[in-house]
């Protein structure tokens, strides 16, 4: 039986995407593995750490855009490694120059090197400035529903709460906060950080997240390209399960076969 599923696209800053899996480009062994994993993931949006990855600022060095060309992928520059609003804003402006006026950016302002938790005060400050400067801001933040709403009200194009600390692989630690963020949001909510395996991605999507962004879960796997393929399927399955609607949880059994018309 061929079940027809209605078109279900992710829309960010007015642009439509068929894939809800966003991937990072760091930690792979080389650019070829980056390309293969990105293609296996089916990702259309790929995020790039401007302070760590060459996209043209270092002529003569391998350029990520040679394997992930902007004609095929939406390049999402990020401010990884920034610890102040000023550094983050400066990095975004550099990225816009390198990408010929590209305004979509991923903002992250970190609090310290141990936890890599977001510094929410600096994040709010940077988000306000970037929105004023005409950027379409996708913002990495904590799983605080009040803060998520504030970032939406500032004008961020997407809010990206963490599932767990960056690179930890712990999976979603607070489903209830995520649910509240999702229920209150009028912009896409994309889980960012902490995903460890395919089931984590599926759970995020089943909760109603609009997408999942990951890097370490794929790049750090024993077989990154295979894991990328698994993550693609998990995100798709989780989204379909969310749209289908899970059955209610009950304390007691409920027979799956009707009792009417029993013989004997």
Swiss-Prot record:
Top EC class of this enzyme: transferase
Keyword Transferase: yes
EC number: 2.8.1.10
Keyword Cell cycle appears in the UniProt entry: no
Broad class of the protein's primary localization: cytoplasm
Compartment(s): Cytoplasm
Keywords of this entry: Cytoplasm, Schiff base, Thiamine biosynthesis, Transferase
Active site (UniProt): 106 (schiff-base intermediate with dxp)
Catalytically driven reaction(s): [ThiS sulfur-carrier protein]-C-terminal-Gly-aminoethanethioate + 2-iminoacetate + 1-deoxy-D-xylulose 5-phosphate = [ThiS sulfur-carrier protein]-C-terminal Gly-Gly + 2-[(2R,5Z)-2-carboxy-4-methylthiazol-5(2H)-ylidene]ethyl phosphate + 2 H2O + H(+)
Residues annotated as binding 1-deoxy-D-xylulose 5-phosphate: 167, 193-194, 215-216
An annotated GO cellular component: cytoplasm
Protein's pathway: Cofactor biosynthesis; thiamine diphosphate biosynthesis
One Pfam family of this chain: ThiG
GO annotation terms (biological process): thiamine diphosphate biosynthetic process
Molecular-function GO term, any one: thiazole synthase activity
Subunit note: Homotetramer. Forms heterodimers with either ThiH or ThiS.
Family: Belongs to the ThiG family.
Function summary: Catalyzes the rearrangement of 1-deoxy-D-xylulose 5-phosphate (DXP) to produce the thiazole phosphate moiety of thiamine. Sulfur is provided by the thiocarboxylate moiety of the carrier protein ThiS. In vitro, sulfur can be provided by H(2)S.
Protein name: Thiazole synthase
Annotated source species: Stenotrophomonas maltophilia (strain R551-3)
Higher taxonomy: Bacteria, Pseudomonadati, Pseudomonadota, Gammaproteobacteria, Lysobacterales
Gene it is expressed from: thiG
């Amino acid at each position: 039986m061929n079940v027809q599923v209605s078109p279900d696209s992710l829309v960010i800053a007015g642009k439509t995407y068929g894939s809800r899996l966003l991937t990072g480009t760091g930690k792979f062994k080389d650019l070829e593995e980056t390309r293969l994993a990105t293609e296996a993931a089916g990702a259309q949006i790929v995020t790039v750490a401007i302070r760590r990855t060459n996209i043209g600022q270092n002529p003569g060095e391998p350029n990520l855009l040679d394997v992930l060309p902007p004609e095929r992928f939406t390049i999402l520059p990020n401010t990884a490694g920034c610890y102040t609003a000023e550094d983050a804003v400066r990095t975004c402006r550099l990225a816009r120059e390198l990408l010929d006026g590209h305004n979509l950016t991923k903002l992250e302002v970190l609090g310290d090197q141990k936890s890599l938790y977001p510094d929410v005060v600096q994040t709010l400050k940077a988000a306000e400035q970037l929105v004023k400067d005409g950027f379409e801001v996708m913002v990495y933040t904590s799983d605080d529903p009040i803060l998520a709403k504030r970032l939406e009200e500032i004008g961020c194009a997407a809010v990206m709460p963490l599932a767990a600390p960056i690179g930890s692989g712990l999976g979603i630690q607070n489903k209830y906060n995520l649910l509240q963020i999702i229920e209150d949001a009028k912009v896409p909510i994309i889980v960012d950080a902490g995903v460890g395996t395919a089931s984590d991605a599926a759970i995020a999507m089943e909760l109603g997240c609009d997408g999942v962004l990951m890097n370490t879960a794929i790049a750090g796997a024993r077989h990154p390209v295979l894991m990328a393929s698994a993550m693609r399927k998990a995100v798709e399955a989780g989204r379909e399960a969310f749209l289908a609607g899970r059955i209610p949880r009950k304390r007691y059994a409920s027979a799956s076969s009707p009792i009417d018309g029993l013989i004997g």
